[in-house]
Amino acid sequence: MSSAIKILALLMVLVALAQAKPRKDYRAYPDFDDKSVILEDDKRCDPDKRDSVCKDVCGMLDIGTENGECPGKEVCCVDLFGR
């Protein structure tokens, strides 16, 4: 009886692990500057802000894509160190 409970608990853990979404690690992208913060993926950068940089989603950062398809938008990155 206790072995059945152990098997059931193991199955529940495996199902929970299978359903968990993997967290995207942006450090894996060489073009992503970790000194930048991504504010929003669906707005263009404010041209009045000198510290904001627009980066294209396609090719540089895989942010704001749906199933790997590029929406043609830009992401707004703000350099935390004021460069």
UniProtKB/Swiss-Prot annotation:
Localisation per UniProt entry: Secreted; Nematocyst
GO cellular component terms given for this protein: extracellular region; nematocyst
Main location: secreted
GO terms assigned for molecular function: toxin activity
Alphabetical keyword list: Amidation, Cleavage on pair of basic residues, Disulfide bond, Nematocyst, Neurotoxin, Secreted, Signal, Toxin
Phenylalanine amide modification, residue list: F81
Propeptide residue span(s): 21-44
First and last residue of the signal peptide: 1-20
Post-translational modification: Contains 3 disulfide bonds.
Function as written in the Swiss-Prot or TrEMBL entry: In vivo, induces immediate paralysis on shrimps (C.multidentata), followed by death when high doses are injected. No activity is observed when injected into fly larvae (M.domestica).
Stated name of the protein: Toxin CjTL8
Organism: Epiactis japonica
